[in-house]
Amino acid sequence: MTDKQQNKLWGGRFSESTDQFVQEFTASVNFDRRMYRQDIYGSQAHATMLAEVGVLTDEERDAIIVGLREIQLEIENGEFQWSVALEDVHMNIEARLTDKIGITGKKLHTGRSRNDQVATDIRLWLRDELLILEEQFLHLMQGLLNLAEREAATIMPGFTHLQTAQPVTFGHHLLAWFEMLKRDRERLLDCKKRVNRMPLGAAALAGTTYPINRERTCELLGFDGVCENSLDAVSDRDFAIEFCAMAALTMTHLSRISEELVLWTSAQFNFINLPDRFCTGSSIMPQKKNPDVPELVRGKTGRVNGHLISLLTLMKSQPLAYNKDNQEDKEPLYDAVDTLKGSLRAFGDMIPALEPNREVMREAARRGFATATDLADYLVRKGIAFRDSHEIVGKAVAYGVEKKKDLGDMSLSELKQFSDQIEDNVFEVLTLEGSVSARNHIGGTAPDQVRAAVARAREALDNT
């Protein structure tokens, strides 16, 4: 072999160079180099441990650590020359280290494989991203709570089947969004427990013959513990799948919220005004103000769902241990993280800026016989069985549809034609305020309950 397999770090066994197209097809450096910080961090910890167990001298350790620090600066200053011929982030950095410090650089890989190295890098990278995502969740959730508290008594229609159902408060509706995101954040925190385990030391698949101290490396890297089985450590990507499942659920919730915002900002609803900075216009229609942020988040949900399916499909037929298939884990994971981060950031800025059109909301709740259930409950309290009261109110609604009158707009004599149990005090329960205030229990839409729920939610966020 004349070119030493293009100076590849694994070229000793080969007698000819890799085909140029195959080299480009199998290289991952164009996307996995975003993990350079984690790769360097892991290598510095590995070198520290190797020196402590006597595999490296202190001088060799120091040369490696300083050399890696200089390489990080080269990368961050845009001076590093990435090579597709060196395949990935790991071999690019190791080759540059050897260029800088000589044969000592070739000792760094003692006691490890790219298999456990890349598994460690991904976990370190995802752990860093989870911290950012956690802050973004908190920012959005706190914004929701602030808005819910402010709108605790703002009345709007509650919907089922997108038809007016019962009056609720806008604050109560916002807290429903909050509850979705609360569960998503809990899933993120739970996912972190399984992300934060260290594969390093598993080597290729069976461990290593060197006297390594995995617990020490684990401590240096801030992992909660080591992966207990070397085969499993290098081969499974369930932690990435779990993250994508959490991300897909979160995006699904953001998509549901987006759908409501798109509807509510339309001229037909006009419940909400979205500030101009979150909208765009039309190239042909001068009047248009398009809710692009929620529309785009709704659209991006599909790609995150797709990334989850990609990773599940990637893993489903792989025998133990590592296979080249796993190179395909990174791009779906990276994009799922990027998409979720962007969506949470956009919502974190947009939600607190929502401007409700309170009178429009209230008028919409007044239409559509939203207090029909309240009238049925009123009759039950008069001693009428619920199914009978349901039928009575149904007839009253039919009359109201014919006469174009809401229940609260009918006279007492009109209402009494459906039941002689109806008295003057019926109008107390037919008001929108009376309807929402009557649901005065935990989880109910009464303004006092909304404020209490906000207080509990704030306390819970402060304690997690």
Curated annotation (Swiss-Prot):
Pfam families linked: ASL_C2 (PF14698), Lyase_1 (PF00206)
Swiss-Prot/TrEMBL catalytic activity: 2-(N(omega)-L-arginino)succinate = fumarate + L-arginine
Listed GO biological process terms: arginine biosynthetic process via ornithine; L-arginine biosynthetic process
Organism, as annotated: Alcanivorax borkumensis (strain ATCC 700651 / DSM 11573 / NCIMB 13689 / SK2)
Pathway: Amino-acid biosynthesis; L-arginine biosynthesis; L-arginine from L-ornithine and carbamoyl phosphate: step 3/3
Protein name: Argininosuccinate lyase
GO molecular function list: argininosuccinate lyase activity
InterPro entries, A to Z: Arg_succ_lyase_C, Argininosuccinate_lyase, Fumarase/histidase_N, Fumarate_lyase_CS, Fumarate_lyase_fam, Fumarate_lyase_N, L-Aspartase-like
HAMAP family: Arg_succ_lyase
E.C. no: 4.3.2.1
Gene3D superfamilies associated with the record: Fumarase/aspartase (C-terminal domain), Fumarase/aspartase (Central domain), Fumarase/aspartase (N-terminal domain)
Gene Ontology cellular-component terms listed: cytosol
Cellular compartment(s): Cytoplasm
Keywords: Amino-acid biosynthesis, Arginine biosynthesis, Cytoplasm, Lyase
Family recorded in the similarity comment: Belongs to the lyase 1 family. Argininosuccinate lyase subfamily.
